A protein has these predicted regions:
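A feature for loop-to-transmembrane-helix boundaries and adjacent hydrophobic helices
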Residues: 1-289
């Protein structure tokens, strides 16, 4: 990954006919919000687009989750409580996962400044699953039903959130000459890489549409959750192989995210197949009776 510290990055997609343009990482500069420096400290650079985009993803995912919960017969008050807890725990989980595996922070401010980047989706998923299971017990709602709602919501949030990586000039892939290559830098200093953030965003959009279309045909609680993990795991396993900022489990053999993705894909696909067989046997026995 290209570790760019500048607030403005020059981007291009020459193979698609899109010339060089500048992307500013800061949505609102600290100079315009000087009073907030008393809260966040002198090192605070302003409101970053990364944080804005992540927040948009969270809000849209929450709104979709609330609409889906209504269809599932879960009260608005209950699902709102669930969402608030899930969002907080997911963000904490995403940050903890990132800090544990990547580290490199010199101050408490840098450690908690999630608005500047540094969130790991697997940490968010783990935190979200744990919070949903706990809240299902508190609200007396089937855990797998909540996980179905959460899965269909989080994949939408992921699709949007990946664009935070775009403005932060991070999570890119190896250099390539493919027509859809993305240029980073200007003129002779530019390098052309796989836009892996875009690959994952598009993959998640397709996954969201798939889950949305299958939801009305859902046969049992947990089905959408397992489809989500299988779909995302498979896509992440492939896309991660193109990234240059991965955490290696075995150097130059397999990455941590690839292994997690592969495990999710294999286990959840097996569960889906076994449940389908079980459903068909039950239907056949019902017809015979």
């Amino acid at each position: 990954m290209l570790g760019l510290l500048a607030k403005i990055t020059t981007i291009s997609f020459p193979g698609l006919g899109i010339g060089e343009f500048e992307v500013n990482k800061i949505a609102v500069s600290a100079d315009k919000l000087a009073f907030l420096k008393k809260i966040f400290g002198e090192n605070w650079g302003g409101i970053a687009w990364y944080g804005v985009i992540i927040m948009i993803g969270i809000v849209l995912a929450a709104l979709y989750g609330m609409s889906r919960a209504k269809i599932e017969g879960i009260s608005s008050d209950d699902i709102l409580d669930v969402i608030l807890v899930a969002v907080i725990v997911s963000v904490i989980g995403a940050r903890v996962y990132y800090v544990v595996f990547y580290g490199g922070y010199d101050s408490l401010y840098d450690l908690v400044a999630v608005w500047n980047g540094g969130l790991a989706i697997y940490g968010a998923v783990i935190g979200g699953i744990i919070s949903l299971i706990i809240m299902s017990k508190i609200k007396k709602v089937p855990a797998l039903r909540l996980l179905d709602i959460g899965a269909s919501s989080i994949i939408l949030g992921q699709a949007i959130g990946r664009w935070g990586n775009f403005v932060n000039a991070e999570a890119y892939g190896y250099e390539t000459t493919l027509p859809w290559r993305m240029g980073i830098g200007s003129g002779a200093n530019a390098i052309f890489v796989h836009p892996t953030f875009l690959y994952e965003s598009l993959w998640n959009i397709v996954g969201f549409v798939l889950i949305w279309s299958l939801y009305k045909k859902k046969k049992y609680d947990g089905q959408m959750f397992f489809i989500y993990l299988a779909w995302y795991g498979f896509g992440r396993m492939l896309i991660e192989g193109l990234r240059t900022d991965s955490l290696w489990l075995v150097p130059y053999v397999i990455r941590v995210s690839q292994l997690i993705g592969a495990v999710c894909f294999v286990i959840c696909t097996a569960i889906l197949v076994l449940m389908e067989i079980k459903q068909r046997k039950a239907a056949k026995n019902g017809c015979n009776n």
